[in-house]
């Protein structure tokens, strides 16, 4: 099964505060483990929402909304796309992950729809 793994944003990540060298090294090693295990398909960090835009759809209308976006808890600071046997395997890998932020942080795992889900 494929899952997307979201690293949730924090006040620091929204301020553009970059990870420490130690954290970058630890995450690099973790990513290497994921790749060597055949789990990781892609992954990257995101710049703060102040550098992003949202497009709001309402029927035929489109409205562009400039960042930053208010609800930091709902924002994403990074992501991975993984191929795992099941959700339990994804959870086990996330538990091995270095804390992605200084201080409290949160990682969310969401399964992707597969073609079989639509049949």
Regions found by a protein language model. Name each.
Residues 1-119:
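Conserved, structured core segments of small domains
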């Amino acid at each position: 099964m494929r899952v997307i793994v979201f690293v949730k944003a924090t006040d620091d990540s929204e301020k553009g505060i970059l990870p420490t060298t130690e954290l970058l090294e630890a995450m690099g090693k973790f990513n290497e483990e994921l790749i060597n295990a055949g789990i990781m398909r892609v992954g990257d960090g995101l710049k703060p929402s102040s550098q992003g835009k949202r497009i709001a759809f309402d029927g035929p209308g489109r409205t562009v909304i400039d960042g930053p976006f208010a609800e930091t808890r709902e924002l994403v600071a990074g992501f991975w796309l993984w191929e795992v046997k099941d959700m339990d395997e994804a959870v086990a890998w996330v538990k091995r992950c270095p804390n992605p932020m200084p201080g409290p942080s949160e990682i969310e795992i969401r399964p992707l729809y597969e073609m079989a889900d639509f049949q």
